[in-house]
UniProtKB/Swiss-Prot annotation:
It comes from Mus musculus (Mouse). Guanine nucleotide-binding proteins (G proteins) function as transducers in numerous signaling pathways controlled by G protein-coupled receptors (GPCRs). The alpha chain contains the guanine nucleotide binding site and alternates between an active, GTP-bound state and an inactive, GDP-bound state. Signaling by an activated GPCR promotes GDP release and GTP binding. The alpha subunit has a low GTPase activity that converts bound GTP to GDP, thereby terminating the signal. Both GDP release and GTP hydrolysis are modulated by numerous regulatory proteins. The keyword Lyase does not apply. This is Guanine nucleotide-binding protein G(s) subunit alpha isoforms XLas. Residues 958-967 are annotated as: G3 motif.
Length: 1133
């Protein structure tokens, strides 16, 4: 019986302590056609077995190790008891300090776990039996080149390919069907060691996968694909370097294990220069390791018959073709072949599923295969689940690409449809559908462009390829008798198992040499984005027995050896047509050498044409051919895809170690490696030197040696382009939380700055308020109260004249220049007020002449028309004061009748300034009249509202508030009672014989007494002292001296009043006047003393508001009183 071998994520080469899982070999149905594995991302065998309810418990449950990863199987000692005595140098492991490059064939070790009683021992026909060492060897994964007499133990030494002893296979007659083809795991070189497990424990059968299709959203579980870390970070010291997977068993999808006997005999013949063993899919394939043959094999061993169970393919990761069957019916290998040439294995980053956005990138690396034909079934490219389709159904669909090939071959020229279609690399053989990734299969357009091509089962159909005229003639002239000989080396398909190379867009000149040998060394071209001006270069199929290209010169022995070495450097295709192969298909070694020479020369010509054309982008180019020799310089790699693969935390369980973009530029060796990363020793050493505790970005930036070599010699290894591409690649997406934190920090900083500015502004405001408060406390606020027309506004005018340098509008100005300018402007506006006073005075007198009892007559009756004129303009608004007005007013004022009416002014309401302005008619009527300060003081303007005047006396601030004295204006006074230092109550002493305007029955002096009493007794003003200004002393003296209006007539008490002894008359003042004024004073003092409580006082002063010197002297006397009141107000006195 046999075993089907595929890669397992937890059982890779180099991990010797993890044997294959128990219970992974269900019985399989009969095998009809082995082939490449179907690329898929479905659940692996271990995961399906874990979900099977009837399965027996396994003794290798996942055991988490120190790093948190799961390791399947019981731990075993990685060292073997059997060590090869011919070991040439010390075994190199992953955790070691040195790993030779892939050019040097690295030894690999094999492990021999016990098989138990499940697998039968190997049968070997012939006189000699199988040695005991091979009884425990798994026939399904038998290493080619393993000696029949002895099996190398764990840690055995395998020499490099230059010293390796060749071996050859002898095929018995085709009639003997007693042995299936031997399957050899596709391994790739490039690492320190390669582990090939030899047996599997028993596993319950009757397990069939329900879903064998493709799932794009699937990531294999850790049991199937667990990446490893360099330096034993994940599994200890025996973890392989990146890109070297472990070989694990794969479950078949059959119910039983019937044996299909296929004739196959293994004869290991010693030879000095045997050709290398070709392993299908060893180049440009992820999870591949090259299998090398140990030296000193015995050639006289009898044939060995090996049986194995049926092969049925479940699922495999896209781009991973690790279940290729091994054909024991390959042509014989001569004993004088060149040494083994081994290509490197690509990085592991291609394992698991590919994102849908990676279609073009995945096509660059080699078009993966679909499900292999199992039991005569071919996975249908039209179905997304990867289910199989019968070959008959495939035959019913003729492939247009295949027809184009036959037509092009007969005509000897390539057809446009064959050259421009994407199916040129998708044509399979043995009924195998073109391998496409799951994302490509889900695309109807791609499916239409890549139709399934099923060739004749015995014909070995070649991929769709335009052939050169020479080869077209060779193909067209080939006779049917020569066809069977070509079946031994089937045509390469577009799958990655045949070492697929990317389709390179080349110029027509390079396309002339596009036909290459279809040996396993020739690589089919996967699908790549088409460009309008370029044509794909698919791999063409050539007859291996043709010997040479027609017209090609003869080759010498050394050239043939070099060509054979280049040709055999590619993978060996075993068993692709094993059931249909015949002994006649074996080709001779010279034919192989010539074909290999053609392949190498064509590939180098393609590479030369590609570099010369410079039409395609280097980012989509791969090494031109897998036949790169050891002596060739390192091949520059295209830059890695920066955003193709998700990050570590986004790829599921299967990819937790390899990042999407590496922090260092990876340098390829001469091995043909994948896009994502090299698996050569140099790259392995670079990764190994990384410290596991630090991220890659930190390691790159902190390694000066690597940075120096990268900058100095980066161009030699393709580092400049890689670095440039990485620098141009889009950066990692910004973390929204980090952006939010930055925004919050920015807002916090702005808020702090705003708060700081607000605090500073608040401090300035507080300081200003403090200054204002201090000024407010140091300011003396004086409130002018009194009855109407008492002279309050005149007092304010005097303060402005005395302490504010004239009139400056309604308020004071500290700037003298501004005060003067404002004073001039205000004086100009006061002219109209003065004229209005003049008009009002003459009109009032003329009107009273007829209203008085007895009426007053004009002394000159000729002035009657003048009286009529004055009465006619009495109520005219906006009077413009024409010159005749002044003439009529002057003539009337000179009339004696008018003067007599003025003497009775106490009987009607006449303004106090009437006589003053009537005497100045000649001055006022002038056009350039400018009122004087006395004119402004005399001018009468009705005060309505509250007016504040600020002035300063000896650096002491005073605020004086003027209010209207009429009854309807007194309600506004309450607004000025707050924080008043003193109240200046102004009384018109001369108004004793006059009545108020509001009431013709109320005496003005009596009105003033009543108002003073109310203010003095007001509860809000009971703590505020009152300065009493007994105003209009000049008018009072005139009336008293005139004798026409006696005070005792209005105030009878005056008759009994005597002048007090402390009275101080003015110089030259009449005693009658002194007695009159002191009488009025005592009337107010009697009110204050009658209700006084000692908390406020009354300070009387005799004033004449129009006398500036009098007001200056009075105000200076009041300053001390005001300051004393201020100190008492704040309880400082």
């Amino acid at each position: 019986m046999g075993m089907f071998n595929c890669l397992h994520g937890n059982n890779m080469s180099g991990q010797h302590d993890i044997p294959p899982e128990v219970g992974e070999q269900p019985e399989q149905e009969p095998l009809e056609a082995p082939g490449a594995a179907a690329p898929g991302a479905g659940a692996g065998p271990a995961e399906e077995m874990a979900t099977e309810p009837d399965s027996e418990p396994s003794n290798n449950e996942p055991v988490p190790d120190e790093t948190g990863s799961e390791i399947s199987g019981p731990p075993e000692d990685s060292k073997s008891d059997i060590q090869s005595p011919c070991q040439a140098f010390e075994e190199v492991r992953v955790g070691g300090d040195y790993s030779p490059p892939p050019e040097e064939a690295m030894p690999f070790e094999t492990q021999q776990p016990s098989l138990g009683d499940f697998w039968p021992t190997l049968e070997q026909p012939g006189p000699s039996g199988t040695p005991s060492g091979l009884q425990a060897f798994n026939p399904a994964i038998l290493e080619p080149g393993t000696p029949t007499g002895a099996s190398p133990g764990l840690g055995a030494y395998t020499p490099p390919p230059e010293e390796a002893m060749p071996f050859e296979f002898n095929e018995p007659a085709q009639g003997d069907h007693s042995q299936p083809p031997l399957q050899v795991p596709d391994l790739a070189p490039g690492g320190p060691e390669a582990l090939v497990p030899r047996a599997l424990p028993a596993e319950p059968g009757n397990i069939r996968f329900e879903n064998a299709g493709f799932r794009e959203d699937y990531s294999p579980p850790p049991e199937e694909s667990v990446p490893f870390q360099v330096g034993g970070e994940e599994f200890g010291g025996d973890s392989p370097p990146p890109g070297l997977p472990r070989v694990i068993p794969q479950i078949g999808i059959g119910g039983e294990f019937p044996t299909v006997a296929v004739p196959s005999a293994l004869c290991l013949a010693p030879a000095e220069n045997a050709p290398p063993l070709w392993v299908r899919g060893a180049i440009d394939r992820p999870f591949r390791e090259a299998v090398r043959s140990p030296p000193n094999f015995a050639c006289d061993s009898p044939p060995m018959e090996i049986t194995r169970p049926l092969l049925e393919i479940g699922r495999a990761s896209i781009g991973v073709d690790d279940d290729t069957a091994v054909n024991m019916d390959s042509p014989p290998i001569a004993s004088d072949g060149p040494p083994i040439e081994v290509s490197g294995a690509p990085d592991k980053s291609e394992c698991a599923e590919r994102p849908p956005v990676e279609r073009e990138a995945a096509e660059m690396e080699g078009s993966p295969t679909t499900a292999t034909a199992v039991e005569g079934k071919v996975p249908s490219p039209e179905r997304g689940d990867g289910s199989s389709t019968q070959p008959e159904a495939m035959d019913a669909k003729p492939a247009p690409a295949a027809q184009a090939v036959s037509t092009g071959s007969d005509a000897g020229a390539p057809t446009d449809s064959a050259m421009l279609t994407d199916s040129q690399s998708d044509a399979g053989e043995d009924g195998t559908a073109p391998g496409t990734p799951s994302d490509l299969q889900s695309d109807p357009e791609e499916l239409e462009e890549a139709p399934a091509v099923r060739a004749d089962p015995d014909g070995g159909a070649a991929p769709v390829a335009p052939a050169t005229p020479a080869e077209s003639e060779s193909e067209g002239s080939r006779d049917p008798a020569a066809e069977p000989a070509s079946e031994a080396v089937p045509a390469t398909t577009a799958e990655s198992a045949s070492g697929a190379a990317p389709v390179t867009q080349v110029e027509p000149a390079a396309a002339a040499v596009s036909a290459t040998l279809a040996e396993p060394a020739a690589r089919a071209a996967p699908i790549t984005p088409k460009e309008p001006t370029t044509r794909a270069v698919p791999s063409a199929r050539a007859h291996p027995a043709a010997g040479a290209v027609p017209g090609a010169p003869a080759m010498s022995a050394s050239a043939r050896a070099a060509a054979a070495r280049a040709a055999y450097a590619g993978p060996l295709v075993w068993g692709a047509r094993s059931l249909s192969a015949t002994p006649a298909a074996r080709a001779s070694l010279p034919a192989r050498a010539a074909a290999a020479a053609r392949a190498a020369s064509a590939a180098r010509a393609v590479a030369a044409g590609r570099s010369a054309s410079a039409a395609p982008s280097r980012a989509h180019l791969r090494p031109p051919s897998p036949e790169i020799q050891v002596a060739d310089p390192p091949t520059p790699r295209p830059p890695p895809r920066p955003t193709a693969w998700p990050d570590k935390y986004e790829r599921g369980r299967s990819c937790c170690r390899y990042e999407a973009s590496s922090g260092i530029c990876e340098i390829e060796s001469s091995s043909d490696e994948s896009e994502e990363g090299a698996t050569g020793c140099f790259q392995w050493l670079l990764r190994r030197n990384r410290r596991p505790g630090l991220p890659r970005s930190h390691t790159v930036g902190s390694n000066p040696v690597r940075n120096f070599f990268t900058r100095a010699f980066g161009s030699c290894f393709g580092l400049s382009e890689c670095t440039r591409s990485r620098s141009l690649s889009p950066g990692k997406a910004k973390d929204p939380m980090e952006e939010r934190r930055k925004q919050m920090r920015k807002e916090a900083i702005e808020m702090r700055e705003q708060k700081r500015a607000d605090k500073k502004r608040s401090k300035l405001i507080d300081k200003q308020l403090e200054e204002e408060k201090m000024d407010y406390m140091c300011t003396h606020r004086l409130l002018l109260l009194g009855a109407g027309e008492s002279g309050k506004s005149t007092i304010v005018k005097q303060m402005r004249i005395l302490h504010v340098n004239g009139f400056n509008g309604e308020g004071g100005e500290e700037d003298p220049q501004a005060a003067r300018s404002n004073s001039d402007g205000e004086k100009a506006t006061k002219v109209q007020d003065i004229k209005n006073n003049l008009k009002e005075a003459i009109e009032t007198i003329v009107a009273a002449m007829s209203n008085l009892v007895p009426p007053v007559e004009l002394a000159n009756p000729e002035n009657q028309f003048r009286v009529d004129y004055i009465l006619s303009v009495m109520n005219v608004p906006n009077f413009d004061f024409p010159p005749e007005f002044y003439e009529h007013a002057k003539a009337l004022w000179e009339d004696e009748g008018v003067r007599a009416c003025y003497e009775r002014s106490n009987e009607y309401q006449l303004i106090d300034c009437a006589q003053y302005f009537l005497d100045k008619i000649d001055v006022i009527k002038q056009a350039d009249y400018v009122p004087s300060d006395q004119d402004l003081l005399r001018c009468r303007v009705l005060t309505s509202g509250i007016f504040e005047t600020k002035f300063q006396v000896d650096k002491v601030n005073f605020h004086m508030f003027d209010v209207g004295g009429q009854r309807d204006e007194r309600r506004k006074w309450i607004q000025c009672f707050n924080d008043v230092t003193a109240i200046i109550f102004v009384v018109a002493s001369s108004s004793y014989n006059m009545v108020i305007r509001e009431d013709n029955q109320t005496n003005r002096l009596q009105e003033a007494l009543n108002l003073f009493k109310s203010i003095w007794n007001n509860r809000w003003l009971r703590t505020i002292s009152v300065i009493l200004f007994l105003n209009k002393q000049d008018l009072l003296a005139e009336k008293v001296l005139a004798g026409k209006s006696k005070i005792e007539d209005y105030f009878p008490e005056f008759a009994r009043y005597t002048t007090p002894e402390d009275a101080t008359p003015e110089p030259g003042e009449d005693p009658r006047v002194t007695r009159a004024k002191y009488f009025i004073r005592d009337e107010f003092l009697r009110i204050s003393t009658a209700s006084g409580d000692g908390r406020h006082y009354c300070y009387p002063h005799f004033t004449c508001a129009v006398d500036t010197e009098n007001i200056r002297r009075v105000f200076n006397d009041c300053r001390d009183i005001i300051q004393r009141m201020h100190l008492r107000q704040y309880e400082l006195l």
